Amino acid sequence: MKKKRLLITGSTFPRYEGDTEPRFILDLAKAMKEYATVTVLVPASPEAADREILEGVDVIRYHYFPIHSLETLCYPGAIVPRIKEKKARVLLVPWLFISLYYNLFKMRKEYDIVHSNWLIPQGIAQSFVSTPYIVTGHGGDVTSLNNGIFRRLKRRCLKKAVGVTAVSEPLMSVLEDIYINKNRAVISMGCDTSFFGKEHYKENLFGQGDKKVILFVGRLAEKKGVTYLIEAMKYINDAMLVIAGDGPLKEELTQQAEKMCKEKQCECIKFIGAKTHEQLRSIYASSDIFVMPSITAKDGDKEGFGLVMLEAFASGLPVIASRSGGIVDLVKDSINGCLVEEKDIKGIANKINIVLNNERIYNKLVMAARSTAEQYDYKVIAKKYNDFIDKVIKE
């Protein structure tokens, strides 16, 4: 039987092999190749090829500004943080929308269905093109910009779609408040479980000596809540906090950490920067516990799902996380991890101390971690997406 032709669109994607940009769209595209002929359409970047085969996936990058060296709206990071970092980048937004629409219109007859990742800009642009599409809400595209013209555009996007998915139940609830599409499903992000594991352990990778390693991986931005994790180190001994990531709060958090280390008279916090997928595999495997202290940001943005927690699970790490956004879909308190309230500094420290100092609890969470990860393997997630797409196409 002839495979369907699937176009996957997004605005976060690796620019080249070994890039530190999130790769979940790439991994999904690779897994979907079992069911469809897959092409990915993403914004151009000065560091990326206009078209290439990346890890077996056909990738097209569209230009959106006459001066290509100024196409800096989407990378590194994401659109909203990039604008916050440099306000002038907001001038690139209309160019991006227009160019995305033009490319989607030009390609409208080449594909049977489009999978638009993020309502803004992909879903909204797609709603003005005739090709059938499903749209997936990932996080800030759902929880922020929900007034005025953006709410109307989001409603149009959800109404015109042949199907709507969200990566977590809390996000789906927000989408349903905007518009209830009869074809909707919660399908989380996935993880290549075969890629991660304790076999990638490297001894004394962080120069921690005999200290336990507490790991955070993610963008250094407000909603990640890293400042509360750093404060929690006041109440934790014989451990090193390793922070892997980059972002607008790096300088502020580094100063906070230096002050903390000075007060404790030890090197208990280490920043290692953004790392590649390959490097992260050993970083997870060489750590003892993973912490995700996310919060609701001032603009309403919150964690959509928390893919790094899934990678930590796949690496056999106990996870401690905030009850925030889509995290609660993945982490079940005292079953496969521990949950604390947002901004609860002593709560974070208490849970870390309990898990690290109680071998029975630690081993129980380690066993549950790997079991949880296997439920979210990309083969499982790709089948869910394919079944959903087949269902909505038939209707």
Model-derived regions: residue spans:
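A conserved mid-protein helix/loop that constitutes part of the nucleotide-sugar donor-binding site
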Residues: 23, 212-235, 248-252, 346, ...
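Acidic anion/phosphate-binding donor-loop and adjacent secondary structure
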Residues: 68, 145-148, 173-176, 182, ...
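Short alpha-helical donor nucleotide-sugar binding micro-motif in glycosyltransferases
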Residues: 274-275, 283-287
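N-terminal subdomain of nucleotide-sugar transferases
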Residues: 1-63
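Acidic donor-binding loop of glycosyltransferase active sites
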Residues: 285-300, 317
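Conserved acidic donor-binding segment of nucleotide-sugar-dependent glycosyltransferases
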Residues: 330-334, 338-345, 353-360, 374
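Nucleotide-activated donor-binding/catalytic signature segment of Leloir-type glycosyltransferases, i.e.
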Residues: 254-279
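Short hydrophobic beta-strand element within catalytic cores of glycosyltransferases
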Residues: 309, 314, 318-321, 331
